[in-house]
Amino acid sequence: MRVNILNFLSAGFFLVFTACNIQVVDSAKRSALRYQASILVHVDPKGDGDGSHENPLGTLEQARDKVRELRLAGERRNIDVILNDGTYELEKTFILNLSDSAPEGSVTRYIAAKNSTPIISGGVNVMGWEKTDLQKENIWVAKVPWAKGNEFFHCLFDNTKLLSRAQSKKIIISNKSRVKDYAGELKYKYEFGFEDPGNNGIIRNWDNLEDIELFGMPTRKWLVNYLPIESLDMNNKEGKLAIQATYRMGGEFFVENSLDHLDTPGEWALNSKKGLLYYWPKSGKPGENIVAPRLDELIRIEGESDMSIEGLNDKPVNGIVFEGITFSYADRQKWTVDDIGLQHDWNMWDKSNGLLRFRGTKNCIVNNCTFINSGSDGVRFDLFSQNNTVQNSTFNNLGGTGILFSGYGPGLKDVNKRNKIYNNELKDVGSLFWHSPGIFIWQSGSNLISSNHIYDQGYSGLLISGVRRRFFDPIFKKMGQGYPYSRWSFPKGGRENLGAIRWDEISLESITEWSSYEPYMHARNNIIEYNEVHDCLKRLHDGNAIYLSAHGNGNIIRKNVTYNHPEGALIRTDDDSHNVAVTENICIGSKEPEAQGLCLKGLNFFENNLLFNSMLLTGSAGNTADIRSSYQKNIVYFSKKDSVFHQRLNMFSENLNKNIYYNPNIKLAENFIVEEQKGKRDTESIAADPLFVNMSEGNFSFKKKSPAIKLGINAISLEEVKKIGCTRDPWLERAIKFKGFPMVTK
């Protein structure tokens, strides 16, 4: 049965997906590499003309309206809006809707003029600074009367540098809950007690309490929250939040945005009640480019969304292209009581946030753009999203997620699919919301995520997920069934996932078998290949380079390289992750001898992978590994004498087999196999040098006498290794600059 399932994954699903992807790739080529547009509209920040080359228009809105006139008059050819050099400052979100949709087969392209770098900005320069007598006259103040309500900002930049908001010393947060599970009762996500170590007066009833936030990790260290305070009882040292925390309150927190704690050069605080911004510049005087973001989203391309299954009134915007443009300065995501959280609140569902947001779109392209210096997400595709592409772009210094594709919640509406994320560089994404991944695929399927370079992440690099079984308690109750996941109880009214589930469309034959849930999980048939993911988990814990949970069948993780991960597995299938083929990946450990390479839960197939100084293991919390899973034909190679080849694999028997284990102390590897075979595991596995052709040059083909050939292990050829990473900066070219292999940077 295992072989048939694996063949189905690697052959059947792949053939179907490849056919879909051919369509996506061809669509991208037709649009991004378009022939010269017949109609040109020119725009310049200093313009005041008619849109001609000689007399450009002055704003994006004017250019959009010009295009609308042309389309309304029947123009069906391509239209290029040419953006000249300069900064296009937005005072409100720039919206493209169905009136701006291109006819089928055509595009409307917002494109940089030749040799130009147009910048679209949601920021405003803060001027009029005056010195105060605070902190020995080191703190300056500026009037920002507009910075309240929706324009209250949560981040500030000195040109390209994200400045630190005033932050207190840590306080200890507690609650009165007797239940120790991290979800707990709803009220304990709002109510909290606090301790002030040393009685330093860290927390008090400020007159602008609505501006103050608690920052920290409620109960678990795989996420952070920014939580506005509704009220404080100083006598009893208790408080209440204005919005719920992800989990019950508890742990170390910090008070942010109080003038009381503006005590370090480089910090700032905003008092919206007085309309004053305070700042302690490191240089002694505020620079000329102190920028405050005043928008949550800079540009939104929005069709009409029909929430019904049939979607007869779904009308996506077609054929909008952005090329060669830089996007900067949106505010950090603001959470509200109406938000619906994606897994662990790692982002919010259908949220008005991001530098560039597509909501109900098809055949749209983001090509050769830069998303930089912002508190928000880079680009996100919500709800209906088909045949859209993000390629050849750079994401850097963002407070939120780099690229998000987020469909509808579990149910029968599956319309976020067949998209492409190709050849992008994502660095230092999640600088504010530390848990934000570089790429996040939620309830979105049949996508190609290929040749991206993701690194310097606060948490995980690349995620595919949906909603776990433990959230479906309302259906269990309707069925007269008890709750089988008592360790994880999620109360009614919780933010995470519940509001996105399409309850009336779901019918379960079994509340424990994943096969009953799978039809409603639309993150299926994705191909993740040739990506380079490294140096993640720089701020949080329990994260991974590539991570999967609660998705549909048929995802393929192949020919990626992952390395420099301080803890946790490089590639991990977590709770409710099934029928994933993890194959031909290169995993390089950095915490010898117990670096985690591949971590398996569920029914999955880990075959033909190369693990250097990293081990195989299974997860121990939540659902565990299915014994029908496969750990076969992998090479586990240690370059030092200390090695741990795998952990917690005792439940396996014949499906843990035909692996090669190598250690310079070959006797150690041989003894390991002898012990394994006592448990009827690794019966055909061997301890041997796999005899790569030239490991130091990245050629993992096998020499003629390699024992891997006899075991049927597939080689990863030099030609395939050269494809890994961004095409403009391939991984191997950097790797071979280091002496020896595997390459582990510092």
What are these regions (language model features)?
Residues 91-99, 105-109, 580-697:
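Predominantly extracellular beta-rich ligand-binding scaffolds that present long acidic/polar faces
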Residues 318-329, 362-373, 386-400, 414-430, ...:
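Right-handed parallel beta-helix
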Residues 39, 77-79, 86, 92, ...:
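The right-handed parallel beta-helix/beta-solenoid scaffold, focusing on the short coil/turn
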Residues 1-9:
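Bacterial N-terminal signal peptides that target proteins for export
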Residues 92-93, 296, 331-337, 353, ...:
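Short glycine/acidic-rich loop motifs that flank beta-strands on beta-rich extracellular proteins
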Residues 42-372, 411, 472, 480-484, ...:
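Extracellular polysaccharide-degrading/modifying enzymes targeting complex plant/algal/animal polysaccharides
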Residues 18-19:
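C-terminal motif of bacterial Sec signal peptides marking the signal peptidase cleavage site
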